[in-house]
Swiss-Prot record:
Domain 4Fe-4S: 32-90
Binding site for [4Fe-4S] cluster 1: C49, C52, C57, C73
Keywords recorded for this protein, A-Z: 4Fe-4S, Cell inner membrane, Cell membrane, Electron transport, Iron, Iron-sulfur, Membrane, Metal-binding, Repeat, Translocase, Transport
Top EC category: translocase
Identification of the protein by name: Ion-translocating oxidoreductase complex subunit B
Domain 4Fe-4S ferredoxin-type per the UniProt entry, residue ranges: 104-133, 134-163
Function: Part of a membrane-bound complex that couples electron transfer with translocation of ions across the membrane.
Binding site for [4Fe-4S] cluster 2: C113, C116, C119, C153
Amino acid sequence: MNGVFLAIGALLPICLAGGALLGYAAVRFRVQGDPVAEQVNALLPQTQCGQCGYPGCKPYAEAIAAGDKINKCPPGGEATIRALADLLDLEPEPLDAAEETPPRVAYIREAECIGCTKCIQACPVDAIVGAARLMHTVIADECTGCDLCLEPCPVDCIEMREIPDDVRHWKWPQPSPRLIASDRERAA
């Protein structure tokens, strides 16, 4: 029993000194980040897809904090653009896609899937479920359409399909910017 107390007595001062040293180092050598970039990064979807032209969400957040446009994130969509506009006190802008494409989700042709799990490892939002050497499937509500699962698939059994319009993601058209007759009378 004395050996246990002796070991505790010997290790306790070493642990306390190590903890104090780590605490001091954390305060002394702290890396100051941009708080605006951290807040912007928290709003981005963290898919690391690169569709915005940056290698990941953190570099894009830093670019937004430095003044870049807030409308380059297709997986985040309009909800992210509105949240960023509210945070930065900017006007929301329409999504700046290279070409206007409808929302898409990944679809795995399960009969062709060999269960290699490479698509699961590539998916940044864990929208693909399955096990090794068994078929995989995509949870459509979780998929952001980032296309990162397509390239690693060795049998090309993954395709991107357009999401059909329904009430959950249908967008109302913007009203016409022209004045209506009653507004013209008041303006005159």
